[in-house]
Amino acid sequence: MSSGNAKIGHPAPSFKATAVMPDGQFKDISLSDYKGKYVVFFFYPLDFTFVCPTEIIAFSDRAEEFKKLNCQVIGASVDSHFCHLAWINTPKKQGGLGPMNIPLVSDPKRTIAQDYGVLKADEGISFRGLFIIDDKGILRQITINDLPVGRSVDEILRLVQAFQFTDKHGEVCPAGWKPGSDTIKPDVNKSKEYFSKQK
């Protein structure tokens, strides 16, 4: 795995690349296009594989939930945009993706994967890296899975909601926090209000 330039609390590495958009067209997009929105940017190893379509379809199927949070989901792999399009045009029952509600970025030179520290250099593919970038372009969360295990869309939604809550209210979110749950005031005395309710 490459070390990369992605660091929590710092600007996310910028990129410009060709993507297959939800309308099936090719378009050059960059991270800066999404300034003012949260971005969930996730890498997957390869098109036409096994775990990858389950993750991509899960994110695509719930793209509207992210959109309601002013959050754009973007997928990326080292495959060409032509390969992405062929996979999108392959029926789900044949291992394809079917129509997508999220852009899929092409990173054939592996520069984006390297910048984000997810390149598995010996195979020339990406680990399952996922990055939550806030509306100011600051990297707030990083997870990187080894190849055989997919990610949870529920957890990513929860994390986006939690970061947005802390941005807005200045309180911090305890383990397992969900919207509507108690939060903690980040102050020695005021935090007792939360802890006094614990069993």
Swiss-Prot record:
Indicate where the modification N6-acetyllysine is found in the sequence: 7, 16, 27, 35, 136, 197
Organism of derivation: Rattus norvegicus (Rat)
- List-wise, which residues carry N-acetylserine? 2
An additional note in the Swiss-Prot or TrEMBL entry is: The active site is a conserved redox-active cysteine residue, the peroxidatic cysteine (C(P)), which makes the nucleophilic attack on the peroxide substrate. The peroxide oxidizes the C(P)-SH to cysteine sulfenic acid (C(P)-SOH), which then reacts with another cysteine residue, the resolving cysteine (C(R)), to form a disulfide bridge. The disulfide is subsequently reduced by an appropriate electron donor to complete the catalytic cycle. In this typical 2-Cys peroxiredoxin, C(R) is provided by the other dimeric subunit to form an intersubunit disulfide.
* Free-text description of this protein's post-translational modifications in UniProt: Phosphorylated on Thr-90 during the M-phase, which leads to a decrease in enzymatic activity. Acetylation increases reducing activity and resistance to superoxidation. Deacetylated by HDAC6 which decreases reducing activity.
Give the Pfam families listed for this entry.
1-cysPrx_C, AhpC-TSA
According to the UniProt entry, which residues carry Phosphoserine? 32
Q: Catalyses which reaction? A: a hydroperoxide + [thioredoxin]-dithiol = an alcohol + [thioredoxin]-disulfide + H2O
PANTHER family linked: PEROXIREDOXIN-1, THIOREDOXIN PEROXIDASE
* Family of this protein: Belongs to the peroxiredoxin family. AhpC/Prx1 subfamily.
For this UniProt record, give its keywords in alphabetical order, as a comma-separated list: Acetylation, Antioxidant, Cytoplasm, Disulfide bond, Isopeptide bond, Oxidoreductase, Peroxidase, Phosphoprotein, Redox-active center, Ubl conjugation
**Which residues act catalytically here?**
52
Q: Where is the Thioredoxin domain?
A: 6-165
For this protein, the Enzyme Commission number is 1.11.1.24
Summarize the protein's role.
Thiol-specific peroxidase that catalyzes the reduction of hydrogen peroxide and organic hydroperoxides to water and alcohols, respectively. Plays a role in cell protection against oxidative stress by detoxifying peroxides and as sensor of hydrogen peroxide-mediated signaling events. Might participate in the signaling cascades of growth factors and tumor necrosis factor-alpha by regulating the intracellular concentrations of H(2)O(2). Reduces an intramolecular disulfide bond in GDPD5 that gates the ability to GDPD5 to drive postmitotic motor neuron differentiation.
> What do we know about how this protein assembles, alone or with others?
Homodimer; disulfide-linked, upon oxidation. 5 homodimers assemble to form a ring-like decamer. Interacts with GDPD5; forms a mixed-disulfide with GDPD5. Interacts with SESN1 and SESN2. Interacts with FAM107A.
Name under which the protein is recorded: Peroxiredoxin-1
Ranges in coiled-coil conformation: none
Q: Which residues carry this modification: Phosphothreonine?
A: 90
